[in-house]
Amino acid sequence: CGSNQSSSTSTKKLKAGNFDVAYQNPDKAIKGGNLKVAYQSDSPMKAQWLSGLSNDATFATMSGPGGGQDGLFFTDSGFKFIKGGAADVALDKESKTATITLRKDLKWSDGSEVTAKDYEFTYETIANPAYGSDRWTDSLANIVGLSDYHAGKAKTISGITFPDGENGKVIKVQFKEMKPGMTQSGNGYFLETVAPYQYLKDVAPKDLASSPKTTTKPLVTGPFKPENVVAGESIKYVPNPYYWGKKPKLNSITYEVVSTAKSVAALSSSKYDFINGMVSSQYKQVKNLKGYKVLGQQAMAISLMYYNLGHYDAKNSINVQDRKTPLQDQNVRQAIGYARNVAEVANKFSNGLSTPANSLIPPIFKQFTSSSVKGYEKQDLDKANKLLDEDGWKLNKSTGYREKDGKELSLVYAAHVGDANAETIAQNYIQQWKKIGVKVSLYNGKLMEFNSWVDHMTTPPGANDWDITDGSWSLASEPSQQDLFSASAPYNFGHFNDSEITKDLNDIDSAKSENPTYRKAAFVKYQEDMNKKAYVVPTNFSLSYTPVNKRVVGMTLDYGAMDTWSEIGVSSAKLATK
Amino acid sequence: MWKVIIRRILLMIPQLFILSILVFFFAKLMPGDPFSGLIGPHTDPHEVEALRRAAGLYDPWWEQYLRWLGNAIHGNLGMSYNLKEPVMTVIGHRAINTFWMSLLSVILTYLFAIPMSIVAARNEGKWQDQLWLTYNSITFGIPPYVFYLLIIFIFGYSLNWFPTGGTVSPDAMGIIPVFFSKIYHMILPAFSLAVFGTVGIFTYFRSGILDEQTQDYVRTARAKGVKEKVIFRRHILRNASLPIASNFGFVITGLLGGAIFAETIFGYPGLGQLFITSISGRDYSMITALILLNGFLGLLGALLSDIIMAMVDPRIRIQ
């Protein structure tokens, strides 16, 4: 999703863990001012202002002041579409359509009108293979005629029409079927951005991605426009005179890339007003910096533990749960989950930036989850032992490990390289599992190199030489987990296939779930079933943080803040040092 | 001599050919591929599969190699998987950055190292010699990136004298401001490379001077009553610079080699940084092109060095 950001008074008291989500600066903003911000990354940013051709996370953030690659819709903090943005969307169940109405005064930064064709053009850049985009997904095939266009069988997209012409402001998108997730931003069923068709129509498709018109001299719709784009390094923004919304307070914003090795030093010498994308291991150095206030927000991410239960049948696109392993017993899976001391680990290593996860849906999606769902947050060795006893696993006093039918309960843990503490944490879990008599050893006796691990987990049909692994995902703002755990999901590393879970997942995306109360209940049932069956075990939710200089006024990390770049200002010409 | 040079250039073709096979083969052995990074719940695995198939990554490596070779002969080194631009375009942009920064650093290195070596050699065993020997031992012994960080911290962050990253300020618009901003941005990395990169020249040049000082022709000159200054300038320095000259070809081609550590730490987008990001992103086409470029530069450097030697030392002839 690529929406602008903003603050409303009701969200200012928001907390994430111990962090404030918004900075309530007692000082007033001066007129004008130049904001200096940075994104932490060790590779150069790849400027690409068309969302359909862009795949660089660094740039996706850095394009924010220009409108975030020309996002159209406003959302609330739970990512549900609301009215008032550059365009509004209206869904109609009967006719199975979405009607997108662009604002009358919505203009590109050269003063030309944003038209209905500009909305349709983004679909072309994604669906027409000539543009070389990697953003095509099967969810888009739900739009009538789009897969035919994608496959080259049709010259136009029959399901996208313009009731008042190409140069009008209304677009009708015809779906094959409606989905309850369509009310959420990031749902993937329809796109949320525009691209300047008139400006780009003469560029050959294969040259579009490298054309100056999409890289250094773009048109945008946001509160600021890029005045200077230095390839790989930085963007200087100035206010966009044609912006339809709230006029920005600042005179300019410079947005740079800063390397990991330098970001803390840059903050301590007050080089930047804030830095995005800092990692948790840097938090200790950042939390007491003079002149800065650290804001935090729930990350849209989940980490979890997988059990290897089967293989992926690539030919039929289905997970087959057929592996011979003690992990097929629910009791064993639960026991291994209960034996982990995730709370202690989070406490010791995360600097307060991780909390044990009670389910697979992070609390930021409060309309879809409930704190009443109980998972494996607390270590419970007694319960784990009891579960294994019940299941007939007897402790062999001489080895210290459990056995059943003469076979030892011995498992392979495919832990992979991560941050500096990864090995310590993996060894810690192995010790915890030993306490309940489960023998666990690392895959090949060491942590796996990350790329090898990805290959090992994602190459069908999947390997038979591991039992436990850890994974983490960043989540889309539409939290349905079909892509992660459905029977056909290739990223379901453990390859479980359970009719009840499939039913739960389908229920979340069913027509009934168009009723929000019903959908929430369906989500909660799904989370409870997943915890009970323990095919995967949730590990942590995490917080992201952003250090903000004390001269900055109006800064917030609230996902529902839609005018942040217009609202943001500074209280003095120089950065605060105290 | 021209015959020899042409023969040497022709010989480069099979050498580069073998190098390209090795690079191609080993690059494919790395786990992961350019599309591994796309894997996520937001991307459709079938689409990733289709991209891999379209890029020909499932063909046997020799088939991929032959396809690549066919294009390369026509001057097309392919598209970068990750940057979605022609490899040559990307390398071209980065090469300009790397070239100017390297040039500045080479000039500065000689400016530091040569006087340093002369002072040390002329005062053999005295405190001046000890000082510069110790200095060079330290800068040689400690990994240079430690110094780079220190330099950034002192001159960039504490004193605020120089920019700490990038090649040009986003505020600079127009030809002249951009030019000066670029120079300003390369001073700190070039200076750091130079100050901590003197050891090679220092060692060769200092011992060269010391060796030449005891030669017969020096004694003869002294006996003839030639002034010490003249002996040093005309005879000793000239002969002592031969070992440095023998390396000069590599210095010239090295201008495009890219400084991996310095570029990464200073956030200076040159070829060195491009190489690292290409490897971690499994950007095969870029990796292959960069290694070939470096291989070619190495061979060319050796040839240039030989030519330079033949020019400065009348005893040597290329045959």
Curated annotation (Swiss-Prot), chain B:
Keyword Endoplasmic reticulum: no
Segments passing through the bilayer: 9-29, 99-119, 137-157, 183-203, 248-268, 289-309
Cellular localisation: Cell membrane
Recorded GO CC terms: plasma membrane
Membrane topology qualifier: Multi-pass membrane protein
Function in brief: Part of the ABC transporter complex OppABCDF involved in the uptake of oligopeptides. Probably responsible for the translocation of the substrate across the membrane. Essential for uptake of peptides larger than three amino acids and for growth in milk.
Record-linked InterPro entries: BPD_transp_1_N, MetI-like, MetI-like_sf
UniProt domain ABC transmembrane type-1: residue ranges: 95-305
Coiled-coil intervals: none
Gene Ontology biological process terms from the UniProt entry: peptide transport; protein transport; transmembrane transport
Entry annotated with the keyword Transmembrane helix: yes
Protein family according to the UniProt entry: Belongs to the binding-protein-dependent transport system permease family. OppBC subfamily.
Name recorded for this polypeptide: Oligopeptide transport system permease protein OppB
Database matches in CDD domains: TM_PBP2
Location (main, coarse): membrane
Taxonomy, superkingdom: Bacteria
SUPFAM superfamilies hit by this protein: MetI-like
